[in-house]
Amino acid sequence: MRLRDDFVAVKVPATSANLGPGFDSMGLALDLWDEVSVHATTGATSVVVEGEGAGNVEQGEDNLVVRALRLALDRAGAPQVGVRMHCTNRIPHSRGLGSSASAIVAGVTLARALIGDADVLGRQEILEIGSQMEGHPDNVAPAVFGGATISWMNEETSEVGSVRLTPPEAIHPVAFIPDFELRTAAARAALPATVPHGDASFNVARGALLAAVLSGNAQASGGADLHALLMEATCDRLHQEQRRAAMEPSLALVDWLRGAGFAAVVSGAGPTVLSLESVGADIRRDAAAAGWRVVPMGVAPQGVQITRGSLSKVEF
């Protein structure tokens, strides 16, 4: 198999995982995009990064996008080449907005674009390779498919699956991004090895409710409106409170926003906080005064896109 294109580019959205009860399974694509371009060369690999992570991420073969690109080329049976890569990063790193999943999805999709064959490295394959590298599909799936996703991995076969939901127009995500980082490994280390059966049951019910709400087809008994359903559906007992010591400001912000009537959750492993509903100017002002960067994002209806190359106009 040969490479048909020598200059390609992709864009990939930020994502928020968990969304409260959907630990390691639910995710949402956000309208904030990284863009990556690649020239195939015969020389050594080089990486230029602008924006988020500039000066901190690897700029050679150890770069996460490059590693994903290499793995995908191998999986497809395509030749390896040197690359000149340019990354325009808008997704903050180590903030719970899926920057690593987006980098991996970008790399695998760049391999698809370089190969230039519409039948090679489709979205399901991108999901599988990305989930293998990331370890779980909750951020990878929305980066691949857009919208809201519910994903799973078969522990025996390592097969990965995902279903996509189209959230109702009332879902208007707003991110509250702090000026401090939290590594995913540190956030996971704060979790207990087991949880009470009652807490697991609580989250199963809220996760199912959230799936119904995000599908846009929820009809509640008792006349509950979408806002009331969303407030209940974003409750969690499995991971957020357990991580309070690792990100006290984030959980305090979640408490404050929910007390003010907004369906707020920790985004992924944190420390970003996500409201699934738009917030008023007074909330934005007070949060900004407390040091939070407030970014209305919207839902990205599409996942990763090839923006340059022979496959740029091919739906996949």
Regions found by a protein language model. Give the residues of each.
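Glycine-rich, charge-dense phosphate/pyrophosphate-binding loop(s)
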Residues: V213-F316
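DPxDG-like acidic metal-binding loop motif
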Residues: L32, L97-V120, V144-T149
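Short beta-strand-to-turn element immediately C-terminal to the catalytic PLP-Schiff-base lysine
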Residues: H39, A143-E155, S215, L274-S278, ...
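Alpha/beta catalytic cores of group-transfer enzymes, especially the acyltransferase/condensing modules
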Residues: L121-I171, A264, G270
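Active-site rim beta-loop-alpha module in soluble metabolic enzymes
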Residues: A175-A245
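Solvent-exposed alpha-helices and their adjacent loops that cap or buttress functional pockets
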Residues: R2-R4, N18, G27-L30, G77-A78, ...
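ATP-binding N-lobe of GHMP and related small-molecule kinases
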Residues: M1-R95, A113-V120, M297-F316
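Contiguous, small/hydrophobic- and glycine-enriched helical/loop subdomains that border
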Residues: Q80-R84, I104, L110-V140
